[in-house]
Amino acid sequence: MIKNICTVILLLLSVLPAAGQNRVKVKISGNVITTDGAPAEYITVSLKNTVFGGMSDGDGNFEFAAPPGEYTMVVQSVTAHRKEFPVTIETGRENVFPNIEVKEDINQLEEVVVTGQFSPQSMKNSLYKVRSVNSDQIRQKAPLDVQSLLNTEIGIRLSNDMALGETDFELMGMSGNNVKILMDGIPMIDRGSTKQSLSQLDVNRIERVEIVEGPMSVVYGTDALAGVINIITKKGPGYSGESTWRVGARIQEETMGKEYQFFNGEGLHNESIDLGFNLKNGLYFNGGYTRNDNGGWQGDLTGREKRWHPKDQSLANGMIGFQRRNLNVWYRLDFLDEKIFGPLNGTAIEPEKVSDKDYLTKRYTHQLQADWRLDNRLSVNLALSYQDYKRRTQTTWTDLSTGEKWLSAEDASQDVTQYKAWIARATATWNIGPKISLQPGLEYQWTEGKGGRIDGTPTISDLAFFISAEYKPWSWMSVRPGVRAFLMA
């Protein structure tokens, strides 16, 4: 396998541009503006049919080097219309191109996707079938959780587990280990085949959701056979040279059928607050807290029992980052405290003796990521994540006549399941030439589990190497071969 991979790499390297392009280079600079005169950030400026180019920063300025000669300059991005014009690059003078005006394309901006792509691009140019739920759609739907956000999406089916109080989902008719949940491109750990992590994310912190249908096993592993759902969170607005701040709050109340009690108890109750600071030196801070109170739904049941279990969630998060022209580094911590309540009635013989089977979950998710664009040809993404998931089953008995409460001593009535995981990923995107790009990557995952049904504290670790290439001989055709090899212990 390793020999075959090396052969593929050597074949790809054989298409490197001619050494003639390594002549003496001169400096090229300028700035890009929008039609209203504002700086246009993150616009790609390149010389057509070459590997020379750069990207505008937060002030719209760009700078790169290229050999002297006559070229066609291309100014484009997924958020703006493409613009081309002839230029002459000469030695001994300043090659400055001021106030290059581009026209923004709002419709195209809404279709930008990143999941499974070599670089951000419009949805119509993706080789995969990708759907995106953007920030405007999220605001219009006013969801209380991720399930209510995705339950109207085509190809997604939700199912409620009455016994555990959890919601599972299917993508393209496949569920469990065939669908991968990502947060900012990092896999989320789950207790089993049920993807409960999807219901344990704060919907108020989501910028957009990208749904990729079809196999993504080369990049994300064999458990992405049906596809992936990538939850992309809100971050700083980017480097702008100015200090800004924001504060937001949200209160939402809903009935559950005909059942409702104001602010607490029956019905659905959501309160959220978030704040952010962006300093002119590139530092940014974000934080927020959300409370989800689901009073459950009794339906046709009587007494204490509920057809849908009540659930109370507290979600907190914080982020600190630094962003400049070609670098974005950030750390994020998410915390979940979830309680799913299972009240039961007493028996006909002892109606005053009732039991409660509750599920108590705590989840910590740490993420450290860095995006570094070295030049117009090479960019690198580094990611490190530590996740700690703990779920406790607690069964108690209560004597309603005396108020006495005690833990149940029955088998399997008390249980603790815990998973810990380290995940590290490194990917690079290398534009070898105008028609071919290469994306190698390395992923390491270490997982430890323990619980009542697990013998001891076993660990699983695997190291994977993957490489993918994209060859685009014509504008209407793209070919993307890929291979993934892994070692598991």
Question: Where are the model-predicted features located?
Answer:
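Extracytoplasmic beta-strand/coil segments of soluble accessory domains associated
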Residues: 130, 147-190, 207-208
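A beta-strand signature from Gram-negative outer-membrane beta-barrel systems
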Residues: 201-246
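Flexible loop and strand-edge segments within Gram-negative outer membrane beta-barrel domains
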Residues: 293-380, 386-420
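Repeated loop/turn-to-beta-strand initiation elements of outer-membrane beta-barrel proteins
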Residues: 282-285, 326-329, 376-380, 434-438, ...
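Short, acidic Ser/Thr/Gly-rich low-complexity loop/linker segments typical of extracellular
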Residues: 50-61
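Short, acidic, small-residue-rich periplasmic hinge/interaction motif at the N-terminus
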Residues: 33-35, 44-46, 76-80, 90-139, ...
